[in-house]
C-alpha cells in the first residue's frame, strides 16, 4: 500500500505545483496589466500633449506673423512714399533745368540778334524788325556790300556792271539812268521797284514764311534801302538766288 500512497502524494504535489504555477502566471498577468495601465495612461496623455503642442505653438506664432506682415507692409508703404517723392523731386529738377536751358538759349539768341542789328543800317525809332526780317535784311545787306566791293575792284561803270551781274532775263527790266532830282524823289517817296524785284524779292514774296510779318511794317523799299549804295543796284538785288 505504500506505493499507491506515494503516487497519490506525488500527484498531489504535481497538481499543487501546477496550480501554483497557474496562480503565479495569473498574478504575473495581473501585474503586467497593472503596469501597462499607467504606461498607457501616460502615453495617451503624452500623445495629445504632443499633438496639442504644435497647435499651441502655432497659435502663439500667429500674432508674431501678423506683426511681421504689418511691419513689412509699413516698410513697403514707406518705400513707395519715398520713391514717389524722389520721382517728383527728380521731375521737378529736370523741368527746372530744361526751363533754364531754354531761357539761356533765348537770351543768347536775342543778344546775337541785337548785336546784328547794331551793325546793320539804322532805321527809324518806331521800326521794329522781327527775327526773320533781321536775318533776311542782314543777308541782303552783306550781299550788296560784297557786290559793291566787287564792282569797285573791277572798276567798271555802274550800268555795264549791272548788266554783267544780272541774269539775261532781268536785263530788260533795268531802269534807265535816273537824274539826280528823280533819284532824290525816289529816295524820299519810295518808288516801286522793277518787275524783277517785285517778282523775285524774298522780302516781299507772299510765299515766304514771314510774308505776313513783312507786310505789317509798311512798304519794303524805304524800309530796306541802304544809304550810301546805288539805289538801282538794290532794286535789282532780288534777281540773285533767294534766301531760304
From Swiss-Prot:
Biased composition range(s): Low complexity: 10-27
Q: Which UniProt keywords apply?
A: Activator, Developmental protein, Differentiation, DNA-binding, Neurogenesis, Nucleus, Transcription, Transcription regulation
Which Pfam families does the protein's record reference?
HLH
Q: Which residues cross the membrane?
A: none
| Stretches of the chain forming a coiled coil according to its record | none
Q: Which residues form the signal peptide?
A: none
User: What would you give as a GO molecular function for this chain, any one?
Assistant: E-box binding
Tissues with expression: Expression restricted to the embryonic nervous system.
Q: Cellular location of this protein? A: Nucleus
Answer yes or no on keyword Transcription regulation: yes
Q: Name one GO biological process term.
A: regulation of neuron differentiation
Q: Name one GO cellular component term.
A: neuronal cell body
Q: Where is the bHLH domain?
A: 93-145
User: Primary place of residence?
Assistant: nucleus
* Residue ranges, annotated region (Disordered): 1-27, 39-82
The protein's matches in PROSITE patterns, at most eight in alphabetical order, are given as: BHLH
Q: What is this protein's function?
A: Acts as a transcriptional regulator. Involved in the initiation of neuronal differentiation. Activates transcription by binding to the E box (5'-CANNTG-3'). Associates with chromatin to enhancer regulatory elements in genes encoding key transcriptional regulators of neurogenesis.
Q: Share what the entry says about its subunit structure, partners included.
A: Efficient DNA binding requires dimerization with another bHLH protein.
Q: Read off the PANTHER family from this record.
A: BASIC HELIX-LOOP-HELIX PROTEIN NEUROGENIN-RELATED, NEUROGENIN-1
**Protein name as it appears in the record:** Neurogenin-1
Q: What organism, scientifically named, is this protein from?
A: Mus musculus (Mouse)
Q: Which gene encodes it?
A: Neurog1
